[in-house]
Amino acid sequence: MIIIKTLSHRIFFPKFSQTFSSQFHQTLRFSISDRRKFSAMAGAGVDDFVKGNVFPNGVALITLDRTKALNAMNLDMDIKYKSFLDEWESDPRVKCVIVEGSTSRAFCAGMDIKGVAAEIQKDKNTPLVQKVFTAEYTLICAIAAYKKPYISLMDGITMGFGLGLSGHGRYRVITERTVLAMPENGIGLFPDVGFSYIAAHSPGGGSVGAYLGLTGKRISAPSDALFVGLGTHYVPSEKLASLKEAILSANLSEDPNQDIQATLSKYSSNPESEAHLKSLLPHIESAFSSNKSIKETIEELKKYQQSTESSVVEWANEALKGLEKGAPFSLYLTQKYFSNVACAKSKPENELATLNGVMKTEYRIALRSALRGDFAEGVRAVLIDKDQNPKWNPTSIEEVDENEVEALFKPLSPEVEELKV
């Protein structure tokens, strides 16, 4: 029997008590009242938060309009979003899809983390956890495989699930106001939403993506966003409305991709500054390569603190501060997981070489990680009490039990369905 010490019960593992199995299986029957309960957290109907319109020229537009929460996504928003995509993909009148945020402050700040954590604290067996991750991860796979042009206008904060909604799409438009980050280690989870797959295809054999995922580094320079591959086109914010209008009024041909590429080329430009991360690439690759353990990464960064180059010292100091904010267990898990995905990239027979395979594995990890005490503690310290002083368990990387980390990757128990994508 595999038991994760910090979990209050034995869920999701191949072997556990039949009594609990029966109880947990019952909780997976997701009722209307469950949906209403989760929706109530948002304070308004999903139709107010996710708006969909199809314009006469065949351009469909999704607008995330939950401004007070920086367009953070909850379960019903996920479901509504995917229903639009599914409907439009089979509608011959729809030629492409644009997604945007309702405010220049944010495209999407991520998942409604406080709502999920609150439900877990009320009931560790809540079916909402499984439903939220199922909705998110199937939506990500749908975006990545979307048959029609998918254009993300990533103006403002684009973090966590915001990168999931945009980073797997074909066209990723950034502005000088775009702020990109995966800060999940800082709340006791791990960088999910398929970011490990994006990271594996980043410069330096995936080391740049691993660096961003482990440290939670915020990318605000357009040149860096383009260098990493998180953005495909830089459009100054003063031109964004004109770009949108040009697409909404365009006479799209039988090959809308060609028309969209031409329009994006017209409004996009090269950032004024060079990519800072590009100049740091040798150091990032050395410290965050897939063959380095998290302990070795930290030791490497400490060596760089003694560099004669001030820019390298500054980078190393910042990276270490970023790592210090993460839960030790999360850091250990993230390094191992990202390394596995990066190493699988060149091995087609490996399930982790595909996004769908990555998301199936990620689903197992997410369901289990969300029930660890670190998640509730991280949300408390960062988002609720805001004392920025989480009490992690374990308290150091040296105390992390590798067997506990390995257990997160194992197939789910027969009573809990694997992700279907």
From Swiss-Prot:
GO molecular function: 3-hydroxyisobutyryl-CoA hydrolase activity
Family: Belongs to the enoyl-CoA hydratase/isomerase family.
Protein name (record): 3-hydroxyisobutyryl-CoA hydrolase-like protein 3, mitochondrial
Primary residence: mitochondrion
Gene3D superfamilies, sorted: 2-enoyl-CoA Hydratase, Chain A, domain 1 (3.90.226.10)
Transit peptide start and end: 1-41
Localization: Mitochondrion
Pfam families reported in the protein's UniProt record: ECH_2 (PF16113)
Record's keyword annotation contains Transit peptide: yes
Entry EC number(s): 3.1.2.-
Alphabetic keyword roster: Acetylation, Hydrolase, Mitochondrion, Transit peptide
Location of N-acetylalanine modifications: 42
